[in-house]
Amino acid sequence: MQAYRGWVALGAFVGLAAVIAAAAAAHGADPAAARARAAGAQMLGWHALAIVAVGLWGTQGGWLGHVAGALFTLGLALFCAAVYSPTLGGPSLGMTAPAGGLLLMAGWAAFGLSALLR
């Protein structure tokens, strides 16, 4: 089995972002913003592990493994943008968080299928 280093590296950097986000949530935010930021940090952390897993699954995952990684990445970007924007003084992004959540769910489905179909 050959790992995909790009997915592993991306997952590691998303994990770094999760730690930074958790630190930001713990320091200096009002309670509501801190809860929102902590939720974003938690999503980053769990999905960092998922992206690393996609990379380690490597060639065994086939094209569905890459689809899962892409869905995790795009879903995180949308979800976290919607969570963090209002807590940092930006606009509310409406349905962006649910769209990101749906993409994350689709990523998990693609990842599971990549295992079942191999």
Language-model features and meaning:
Residues M1-R118:
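Polytopic transmembrane helical bundles with strong interfacial aromatic enrichment
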